[in-house]
Amino acid sequence: MLDVSREDIATGSLPRVLLLLAVPLVAQNLALVAQQVVDLFWVGRLGGDAVAAVGLSTVVIGLAMVPVLVFAVGSQVLTAQRVGAGAVERARRVPVNAAGAAVVVTSVVGVGLVVLPPTVGGLFDPSAAVADMAVAYLSAYSLALVATGASDALESGFTGWGDTRAAFLVNASAIAVNVVLDPLLILGYWVFPEWGVAGAAVATAVGYAVGALLALALAVRGRGDFRLTRASVTPDLPTVREVLGVGLPIAGQNAGRQVARLLVVAVVSIVAGAPGLAAYHIGSQVASVAFVPAQGLGQAATSVVG
């Protein structure tokens, strides 16, 4: 029912195509919000300081995720453009090359998340307990950053191809694994270690690693015209440059928003301390639900327009 062919995108009814493409994307964005709420629930079992630490970490991660956005947006837009131009073999090269470049760049950024958190935490003047947990969360999240970079670039390739159902499947699988692992790794249920807030970050890393592997498996197996060939997995620096050319301007806009969030959180932390940070984080997670439909339609429009 939600199948959309290349011919539908090029010549079909625009409202119908947008709706069919947007439904899985809205569903996956809702699932992502639900996952964040579940994270919040289990971290909340550790106390208000833990919620404040994750809230403090989230804005730092928002900046660290800017390179992920570069390759995800570039992968989606460039794939859509090449598919629309009928350059199917060239389109196949985009997601894999974007994912490979994302892994390289996010690995470097991930090292920064391990090295810099103590310095960054001091800028917000949190309590010692909040700062220590934020450092633990950010250090563990460095693994998630690499997995997310690969998963999002591949997933965005499916979206750019018009196969939003595959993108939903990849994202939903990552979220499901994350949700299952959250209580096990945060609170140490069954045979799992109790890692506290770091467990939430590790659960995210494992979830998105599963998502990346599933996306790769779907691409190897092939879905419609999107399948990996020997030519498509060959490193292609001109394609990577094109991905950067498309993704950098949008990522730059996002970086500006993340810096603004960083300043807001700094003020909240200095003025209201851990309780204020926790309240801000809870409120921002709940408020994110309002943006889900617009995000889904925006992603669908990007796939159509290219």
Regions found by a protein language model. Name each.
Residues 102, 156-184, 198-205:
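Alpha-helical transmembrane segments of multi-pass membrane transporters/permeases
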Residues 1-22, 79-144, 194-248, 305:
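Short alpha-helical transmembrane segments in multi-pass integral membrane proteins
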Residues 21-29, 62, 102, 141, ...:
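Residue-level signature of transmembrane alpha-helical cores of multipass secondary-active transporters
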Residues 16-76, 248-270:
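Signature of the first transmembrane helix
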Residues 51-114, 148-162, 167, 277-306:
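Small-residue-rich hydrophobic transmembrane alpha-helices
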Residues 34-52, 121-128, 186-188, 192-195, ...:
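Helix-terminus/linker motif at the lipid-water interface of multi-pass membrane proteins
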Residues 27, 42-43, 54, 79-84, ...:
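Hydrophobic/aromatic residues within transmembrane alpha-helices of membrane transport systems
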Residues 113, 169-195, 210-218:
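Alpha-helical transmembrane segments of multi-pass membrane transporters
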